[in-house]
């Protein structure tokens, strides 16, 4: 349960809500309940925040724990050096390019020969949060390639998750011109926005390597040889900041270097220290400091140039980003910080804390909620409990006289919107809620109609089902509403949510811990506390809620102590056992730890229990059978008062830490917060040492002043603030979940990319039983956020934590507007977002004060967690703030003139030193006249080593030393090796070892990527060679479990559903639609077959998911059986699945009283559709077979080498001479006796093939293999076969055909000929198969040319040169349509006549055409009366024959011509003889109705409609009836019929029928059976996996058969364009 923690700019540590809130449920859709009016919102159809809207509304939400330090640390700015000791001159600022991501990519135009065989790229950059994926930082492209856009190399940012807006990382991709496919390597973690990063990529012809801040984070050996040949040099182009496909990067680039050699890691680290400043070396091809960008770089066509800025990128050398552990939330969970509070008693000096008891009275000041005796007794107990821990409490009692509040039931934990929702909610089941509005009562059916509106509150009708007696029980004129009003929508109801009470009282939570009283339902909840990392911790909505029945009562006083423990950051002592999500939860506590469980290493693991002693074993303890020395007497346990009596030292340290981190306002003392960590030594000379230190723990840089914004100001006088007021036009959810107020304050979503109730979503307000609303184009839905302090902004940060799967990163946020004080709205346009990296936007040249923003989205499920606005430097709001000062204390003391200096920055250089002397340094924070406690001390021996000097001092606990103070580069700032890194040498060179392709001894058992699946010595693992499964189709084929499992797959627990991407690596029953499968128990199974039957020692099952569902605590089990060669089954029992125990190894225990048996298959069965299995192995004894051993006869012995019985012989047997062609042999002896060994190494261009018993074990390109002589035979048969390059294809030479008479193995040659119309350019048309298995670079090319374009009918060629042959690919020819013809597809208003065709990459021209101009059909009243010479096309003549009398009447001929502009030259008239009216239409089909307001005369129209308003009128073919319309038929809709001049109705009413119309739920991700037909566009694609937005079909209703009415019927869907594999079985 790790929070979303960021290191934003200089580092952002998150703070968020506590554990326990449920994640957002899957949205269901049912008919809405009737009879309940909508809850009143803050305005018509709007949803507003809890505060009144206005720029100076209530105080803003507090900053996160850690203050502004954790909120944002601005880009490292070089500080003014301290006057004392700052002898070095600050280096001048360097230049950096800023790319906004909108077409500023640059192209290298300098005449440089780009590296062909090896290269190194080095760049300093600072990427913005939110990028188009992929975002190209720089890359080498081939502008001549027609077939491959990925030739060359690219360094950039892209997402590696199946979800295309999750987990963005730095990447390095490469594809040489000889390679068949591209290779991409990725950084080890998501990139950090706003941080300066030193990125390097190298390729030496054999290995690709990616470095981040000097650490090698990825490597690959897939690409080999040169990148491109000299022949294609002119085709290569170097791009910066994007690609020609607009994969543009957003952020800064500084110090760009390109080398034509692969630099070593040591050289890269050295380059990092010099910040990219190199002396001129012959290997250095390009070094850019952006002094003259236009000299070497040019923008793309129609593009612009990036901005050039001055950058002070590398000022402070100390990385102050302190991460909490995986299970922690804030700085106080950081192991280094909490260690200081544990070790230093000065950090636990006495603290006085104010708290306020809120006591409600009647108006006459009688009948208090709690008595004064209760208050005093509880206060005494509280003081006694905390006295020994240096925490004392100052009591303030607030007496509120308000009968309306006093007489109401205050509910502690009931969501009032659930009252009367037809589900019994135990937390709302109370007599004064009408037992959850009647939901928790079995109701009879009284004579409600008789009692309705009888002027009496009838309690047997006072339930939601009867509209609470028609409202009479909430009428204060009729009844005592404090006892009878249960309607949650009535203002007179008898109960209040405790948050409603808090909103009424509006008590400041920043000066006191507020204590409220509320009752719970039958659950009898004793108390509820606000965590210190909650947004509400310092607001009026924070505080503690206690049950007044227990408060201050003997035997129950420890409840308040327990809840105060929560408010001060303490978890339950049983958190690591009983409050984990599953037994695979990384926070499960197996031993006391600062990083798991309750984050205290002096509380042993314990389950939840109430006994005063160690608990017994339970069913929910994840395999724990017993617990000893549990902290049952701890205040944070659930034992009774007579048992609990203490906190542990670690808990006391946490409480003191949170009092410094969050709750300084609760304390009367003005003492500033301390610096929680010891100063760090950053460098030394012969006569000086340089120290830097961390900010104070509360993150403040300025003295706090009442009414000022100084607590929001950072170094550089930059103000950072979160939104304080939120609103949206969307309606509001009564529960507050997903409402705008959730986007106020700091980010608090724990698991980004998963739906969370702690966010705003456009869909928030919708009743979960109805269909979600859409956010219509072009504007969509929007959220408006206002900030307390209007300011001129420098940047904006937005946390978008969830985006629907049907939206990519570029479409979800379609606009952001800045709301200026002047009234102007500034649009920032659409933005690319990641769900796990915040969006950061640099605000250029705004130049005026901004007070708010509007965020627009087209995604109704999008979720926004928070927004943060950062000012420009030296903002007026911070100019008057007084900075905190620092005092450095030394032992031995500093000279008086030095000791008296107060430092404004966090750096100090001591020049008063003696070689070999021991010095200790402390730092004290000074605010006004108050001083903090001294920081922990750092001990420094002048002239000796320290963390950061490049030498590992193991006696000081150092594990590595890379000469810097940066986290995330393998060696932490405290010189400790980071997880999954290995560091070597001095100074340390660190590399991410998991997945680097090298199997090292320390990772043999842990790294599947590098070492494969670990097999213990003496055993042999066989992976499945075939498989059959119970449920499969093309989405989840069973064959994927054949062979070893994919190394890249990590086991996942607590999933909601399984994405289609999993089926590429693991099998799961995807044909079952979860959770509907839970309606009936289903058994799923797979059967794995093995090529070599063996005596099983164990069965191994590799998992990708362990079957646990997000909303359920139940663990899944599997049943495993062995199948022997006689098809008999041997049960291995039931086994619990857990990602913590993956792979699952099931030992096979043989009954020694029975004969051994050979197993040939394994059957695995389970009941959860969320189990995904990636591999099954059969483990047996290596070189030992008990079945064969038992069959040996007299005179025979078992041969392990042969694995068979052989005749026993005492004489020594030599092996035959070992002869391997194309190999070199290195034998341990010239003799070939038993035990002799020979090492076989294949020559260059040959590959080892190793066989045993004529079966190929493996083929490897590795250097050698060792064979051993065993009992007269070599234990392996080895051959060296030439590598095979396979037949060349278009990747080698485009537009060519190949001939390989010599074959395709090493050394052979193939020739190629150019296919017409391509022409050979060059002389040598031969390719050679090289030793690396790839073809050599071609020395000639086939240049594609187009012949003269063919004539286009009805068009004239306009380009004269196009009449000749030899046109290059990409060239154009222009045509113009002849009069009366136009280009197809052009609009009716402006019919285009000119068009171009292009010479394409296959040597042909794009097709062009000219189609005749057409006129609209004549009016329908003339239908059937006219004849046309050529339809309605240009020059066609249409005629109606009239009698001669028309001409005599001067009407002229009834003839019209279609003109070239698509209009008729005239119009028809009704002939004189055409008189009368149509007959009354009476032959109507059932349900059809005609309305003829103008009668039945010629030209009159009748509107068609259906008696059933849900039906539509259509025309059906004669042979089709309404009852048998096939789903693929899409009949024409009819809105009206007309009486023609021939006195006939058109269309004829007898052909018109009424059919069921389409429900308005198309495209809503639910497959509605009624809409699953062509007439309704197959429900907008909702019924096919390939077309539904969520890629998972959800039927509605859920009983709808996925093989019947809700089947995929759309003939255009992908499912019907490929072979259906359903039912196909491997086995």
Curated annotation (Swiss-Prot):
* Enzymatic reactions: Cleavage of the 135-Met-|-Lys-136 bond in insulin-like growth factor binding protein (IGFBP)-4, and the 143-Ser-|-Lys-144 bond in IGFBP-5
Q: Does the keyword Glycoprotein apply?
A: yes
- Using the record's annotation, list all stretches that form the Sushi domain: 1213-1282, 1283-1344, 1345-1412, 1413-1473, 1476-1556
The prosthetic group or cofactor this protein requires is:
Zn(2+)
EC number(s) in its UniProt entry? 3.4.24.79
Q: Which InterPro entries match?
A: ConA-like_dom_sf, LamG-like, MetalloPept_cat_dom_sf, Myxo_disulph_rpt, Notch_dom, PAPPA/PAPPA2, Peptidase_M43, Sushi/SCR/CCP_sf
Pro-segment residues? 23-81
Alphabetized PROSITE patterns for the sequence: SUSHI, ZINC_PROTEASE
* Glycosylated residues (UniProt): 390, 402, 429, 480, 601, 619, 725, 825, 1026, 1222, 1226, 1323, 1465, 1519
Segments for region (Metalloprotease): 272-583
Q: Which residues belong to the signal peptide in this entry? A: 1-22
Q: Which UniProt keywords apply?
A: Disulfide bond, Glycoprotein, Hydrolase, Metal-binding, Metalloprotease, Protease, Repeat, Secreted, Signal, Sushi, Zinc, Zymogen
Q: How is its activity regulated?
A: Inhibited by complexation with the proform of PRG2.
Provide the binding site for Zn(2+). Answer: 562, 566, 572
- Free-text remark on how the cofactor is bound: Binds 1 zinc ion per subunit.
The protein's predominant localisation is: secreted
Residues of the region (Disordered) are 23-99, 733-754
GO cellular component: a single term: extracellular region
The record ties this protein, via Pfam families, to: Laminin_G_3 (PF13385), Peptidase_M43 (PF05572), Sushi (PF00084)
Tissue localization of expression is: High levels in placenta and pregnancy serum. In placenta, expressed in X cells in septa and anchoring villi, and in syncytiotrophoblasts in the chorionic villi. Lower levels are found in a variety of other tissues including kidney, myometrium, endometrium, ovaries, breast, prostate, bone marrow, colon, fibroblasts and osteoblasts.
Q: What induces it?
A: By 8-bromoadenosine-3',5'-phosphate.
Q: Name one GO biological process term.
A: cell surface receptor signaling pathway
Q: Which family does it belong to?
A: Belongs to the peptidase M43B family.
Protein name in UniProt: Pappalysin-1
Q: Gene encoding this polypeptide?
A: PAPPA
